[in-house]
Amino acid sequence: VLAGMLLVAGLSFGQVASQDPAVPGVVATQVMMPADKPAEPVVSAVLPTLVPEELKIGTTMENLQAAYNGESNAYKRYLAFAVKAEEEKYLQVARLFRAAAKSEEIHVADRAKLIEKLGSKAVADIKKPEVKSTKENLEASVKGELWESEKMYPAFAKKAKEENAETALEIFKNSAIVENDHAKFFQDALANLGTMKEAKTEYLVCNVCGKTTKDMEIKSCPVCQSPREIFEVIK
């Protein structure tokens, strides 16, 4: 998920990768003294709970980096939202945010793998999540997921198709479906917030594409066709 303002910025300083302990597998950036040549552009998420006014479309590689950065921030943000929901005794909402976080974690790894396969390094600028009330966190999450599923990922998919980037195209198309599902879950939680105090429902998350569902009888993933055994139960 992105749910944040995307800013493509070329750095004039050397770029050093460091591991962000809050997000497994995510590489954060640090700025050092000027290098002999400009560093490659990286994508920065600014105020992660806001939806950008303008969608920036780059090359497929740049779009993969933007998606990686956004999903990395979404992973951390949803974990923080889950903690807040638990504090406010919305235990079902906390479970939902943990399921969404797991889905985003899968997206992070998926994009990193492709970026590295294409000869680059996945870089994310991890921002501290802006945590408000659970109701406000759900509202922000709905906006972010709808923006990703209706605008960002379809635009990225269109660009990937133009560049004959088949693997990226599949990732972007599948992600649009998954993020739209997240938006629906969050909308439902908002509409029924008063009933979300007790955690009664478990979620399944596909470890291949991040598909999230409450259907415990599912036979295979409707997005990537992975078998039921691939799904992880979020309790």
Regions found by a protein language model. Name each.
Residues 1-15:
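Sec-dependent N-terminal signal peptides
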Residues 20, 25-235:
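Non-heme di-metal
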